[in-house]
Each structure stands twice: as structure tokens, then as C-alpha cells.
Amino acid sequence: MLFPEKTEFKKRIPKQKFYTNMEITSNLKKAFVEQIKIIYWQNKLTSTTLNIDKGKSVLEIEVIEIKLNSKNLDEMVLSKIDKCIPYHILFLLEYEGMYQAFISYKEIENEKIKVNKYYHTQWLEKEDLPCKIEGLNMDSVYENFIRQIAGAELNVGSEEKKNLKEDIEQAEEKKQLEKQISTLQAKIRKTKQFNRKVELNNELKKLKKMLEKFYSVVLIMVVCVITIHSH
């Protein structure tokens, strides 16, 4: 059992609720129909059911289990469900007894819902999912779910423990830099003109310098851990 018995809700949600009488693309409707077998609202994690303090941003975390027809599910399906339910959601995808946890950094303000990038685990046994309830209030429980599921993807660039939103923005910045570097390297390989090649290489050095800040702190932390264990 992943979560306390007190949090159990166990309500089946007809998948048609997310596409009947709603504006939805044909591709998204097809994904709901073909990729999903059953949707269950398994748990309601609240300050009352978890016996912790309320959060400033997070009132409830809904645990939605989606049984799949295959291992593939389009993320646009999760995004649609996220936008229909005005609470924070932890998704558990199930296929043939194996599970994946999916979660997005979801911002809810003045009834406006913004769903950001999804983080997910590998396929695991249900009891092995990194979804431990950690924190003294609902905000910290939610943030810790994201950090547990995202893992190394959010461990970038600073010795200081920043807030989750800053970490996510920094991880996205790192990803974009890596993408720019990869594109530029491909362009350099194709460029024949010497002057243009020099110009592109200078640009590449600048991007690599910007990327260094994301790795220098990680290296320092590794050295510190090795030093501690050696004494």
C-alpha cells in the first residue's frame, strides 16, 4: 500500500467525462479511447487524511490511477485531465502489473490552471515507486513528490536549496543550452568556410561556458561526499 488507508477514495471515473461535450481534438479523443482501459481516483491526500498542516498553494493531492491498454500514453491525455481537475495530481499508470508515476509542476491561481513539464519514473513494481509522503504540510509533500519522481533531472546548478519553481526553471535552462550546443556542433561539422567556422566555434565556447555552472556544483558535491567517506 503506497498511501495510508485513511486516504483511500477508490472511485472509478468514466474516461468519456474528459471528451464528451468538451472541446477536444480528434487525436486526443483517439488517445483516450484507444490507450486507456480504466481511470480510478484512488486516493485523496489532504491535511486531514495525512494529519499534517495545510499548504499555501496545495489543498489536496489527488492520486489518479490509469490502467492502460499498452505501455504508451500520450502526455496530452494527462494534461487534459490535469486541466479538468482543479487540484494537484499524482498519476499512477498501470500496465500488466507494472507502474509508472507521472507528475507535473502544476500552478493553480485565481481559478487559472497552468500545467508544466511532466516528470516520470521508469516502469516499477508499485511498492518501489518513489512516492513517499515527506513534509510537514501539503506544499512540501507535493514538492517532495516532484523531486522524488524527477530525481537527477532537478539536481542542477546550485549548492543552495532553492524553491522548486526555480529548480525547474534552471533545469529547463540547462536542457535548452544542451540543445543549442548540439545544434551548433552539427552546424560546425557541416560548415566549410573557415571564417564562419571560427565564428561558430566562438559562439559554441560561450554556450559551453554558460553550461559549466550547472556541472561545477555537482562536481564539488561529489568530491565532498568522497572526502567524507574516506575519513
Report residues per predicted region.
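N-terminal, leucine/charged-rich tether regions that mediate assembly and partner docking
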Residues: 1-96
